[in-house]
């Protein structure tokens, strides 16, 4: 599985200009898209790509008509699938509404929503997951640990004291949820990563989870956690109740907030930020 959106070779300079130039030709040029596909084949040493996706389809440089699921990139993916160069075509990104709109077109086989679910919230269940179920689209969740949000990886109650003074009600909901999540971790003896991985497994609509890891040991731990299967019904029910406590900051805002607050933890021992 791979994606297009970071173009290779002579397209690289053109991509660098897209911050200022939203109609960059690389994103609507099927010749350059084919170059990206062929390069991926070479890197993967495969004659056929199992899944080929559009990276961040909400980027304006793709010039996609979301309502009607039209655009040069979509046309290219459909043609590549017809020609047998790819088996399945998909989407990956952060904008769950845009992903939902495109999934509803029935043109796609696969979607990877980044940061769309954690122990705190699961916004992809508002619109995206129902659309995927309706249209038979496979889901690979990206970043269930909150995109390396430290208080979702390491149970350190000092984070609660750092978050409590913040007046945003969405942050206070995070505190309320973390208190119960940490208590559940204490009661079950399960680490936050294991709770997360097995909680996601409880959701049959999600085919796989791209958890991410910084060390080989993390990969081994994640595999071991997944091997234990879904959480027991009572533990799952408690996490579902925690989800209902209230709206939280979006996960990317929480991640960025944690990067600011971590400087106040002189002896923080969790994952690297």
How does the language model describe each region?
Residues 1, 51-53, 90-92:
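Outer-envelope exported proteins of Gram-negative bacteria
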Residues 1-8:
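A short, structured active-site edge motif that brings together acidic residues
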Residues 9-27, 158-161:
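Surface-exposed, active-site-proximal loop segments in enzymatic domains
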Residues 18-34, 62-66:
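Active-site mouth loops of central-metabolism enzymes
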Residues 29-43, 94-101:
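Short, acidic/polar
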Residues 39-63:
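Active-site groove signature of glycoside hydrolases
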Residues 57-251, 261-273:
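Beta/alpha (TIM)-barrel catalytic core signal, keyed to glycine-rich beta->alpha loops juxtaposed to Asp/Glu
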Residues 253-256:
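Cysteine/selenocysteine-centered motifs that mediate thiol-based redox chemistry or coordinate metal-sulfur cofactors
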């Amino acid at each position: 599985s791979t994606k297009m959106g970071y173009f290779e070779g002579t397209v690289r300079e053109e991509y660098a200009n897209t911050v200022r130039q939203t109609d960059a030709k690389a994103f609507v040029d099927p010749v350059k898209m084919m170059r990206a596909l062929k390069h991926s084949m070479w890197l993967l040493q495969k004659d056929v790509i199992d899944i080929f996706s559009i990276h961040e389809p909400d980027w304006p440089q793709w010039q996609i008509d979301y309502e009607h699921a039209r655009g040069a990139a979509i046309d290219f993916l459909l043609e590549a699938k017809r020609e047998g160069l790819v088996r399945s075509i998909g989407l990956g990104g952060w904008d769950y509404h845009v992903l939902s709109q495109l999934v509803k077109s029935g043109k796609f086989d696969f979607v990877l929503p980044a940061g769309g679910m954690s122990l705190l919230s699961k916004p992809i269940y508002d619109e995206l997951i129902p659309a995927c179920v309706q249209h038979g689209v496979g889901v690979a969740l990206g970043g269930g640990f909150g995109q390396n949000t430290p208080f979702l990886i390491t149970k350190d109650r000092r984070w609660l004291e750092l978050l409590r003074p913040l007046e945003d009600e969405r942050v206070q909901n995070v505190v309320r949820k973390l208190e119960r999540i940490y208590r559940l971790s204490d009661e079950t003896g399960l680490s936050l990563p294991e709770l997360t991985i097995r909680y996601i497994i409880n959701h049959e609509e999600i085919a796989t989870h791209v958890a991410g890891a910084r060390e080989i040991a993390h990969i081994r731990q994640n595999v071991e956690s997944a091997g234990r299967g879904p959480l027991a019904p009572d533990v799952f029910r408690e996490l579902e109740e925690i989800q209902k406590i209230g709206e939280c900051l979006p996960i990317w805002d929480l991640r960025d907030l944690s990067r600011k607050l971590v400087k106040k933890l002189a002896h923080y021992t969790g994952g690297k930020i």
